[in-house]
Amino acid sequence: SFWHGAKDRGDGAMIAYGAARYALARGDKEEARELWPLIEWCLEYCKRKLTSDGVVASNSDELENRFPAGDANLCTSTLYYDALRSAALLGREIGVSGKQLATYTAQAKALESAIESHFGYEIEGFHSYRYYEGNDILRSWICMPLVMGIYTRAQGTIDALFSPRLWTNDGLLTQAGTETFWDRSTLYALRGTIAAGEVEKGMDFLKKYSRRRLLGDHVPYAIEAWPEGNQRHLSAESGLYCRIYTEGLFGIRPIGLRNFEMTPRLPQEWNYMNLNKIRAFNSNFDIHVSRVGEKLHVEVLQEGKSIIKKNIEEGKTIKVRL
């Protein structure tokens, strides 16, 4: 059954993505074991929904048919893709069979190819994505592959997102040519743009968004939507705003219950950035990033004690074990 007749919005992919990432970042083995059957069930549900083109069928999306989403949309498939990757990492930590985890990894690889072949598209002159088969108008959710680390069409997608067709003073339009905006896609897009390495463009639009939302005439939080709900505040959007910094600028991706990858992106006009008192991976730690000539100096401190101190080239990824 589906909530209020909203049809299948891709909930299975949403839950698997969120629960797997949460369990990794939380760092609690017992909690991870408790969540595993839910994650496993949702992954199997999505697998059974795969079309002949290898993407996930769903007859709606999180906008619940306010805008067309076709029979299979980009959002659901990219969420399922990242869920498979996170589940393979999480399962290793809690004793799931290697065969099952290898299957998840193989399914993720196949899905990445299917996303490119089914959704990859020249749309309104941009080398980007169509949201569903038959879609020929730019949609804000073309940002989703960037958020999940798929950069095959990054440049064309970023150009499309910040073109006058989609970007307004209130962030991204849900669909080009309309007046409707939902902050969630703008917040995902800013995160994905910075994570993809387009730091200066991402920061420029992040500043514009922050001035408008956090310091403007409807403050102090990110909003849900307009015109629906008259820009009401919901907590989820504020959480997504924070993730622009943690996953975009600091490039943190959980890869275990005690470890993560980090690809810091220090904006040119900043000399340093610090993220202190991070409670994740069952630990308490700080991350300090500063510029040293052409390189970035990265230091991670756990309970005040330095555990990593190294210089890296911009755009490089380092692994941290707490």
PLM segments and residue spans:
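Active-site core of glycosidic bond-cleaving carbohydrate-active enzymes
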Residues: 1, 12, 33, 37-44, ...
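The substrate-binding groove and active-site-proximal loops of carbohydrate-active enzymes
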Residues: 2-6, 23-33, 66-71
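Alpha-helical transmembrane segments of multipass membrane proteins
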Residues: 21-22, 87
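HEAT/HEAT-like alpha-solenoid repeats
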Residues: 24, 44-47
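A short, charged helix-loop
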Residues: 60-65
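Beta-rich accessory regions
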Residues: 97, 103-106, 110, 118, ...
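Terminal, non-catalytic domain-edge segments
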Residues: 238-268, 276-277, 286, 319
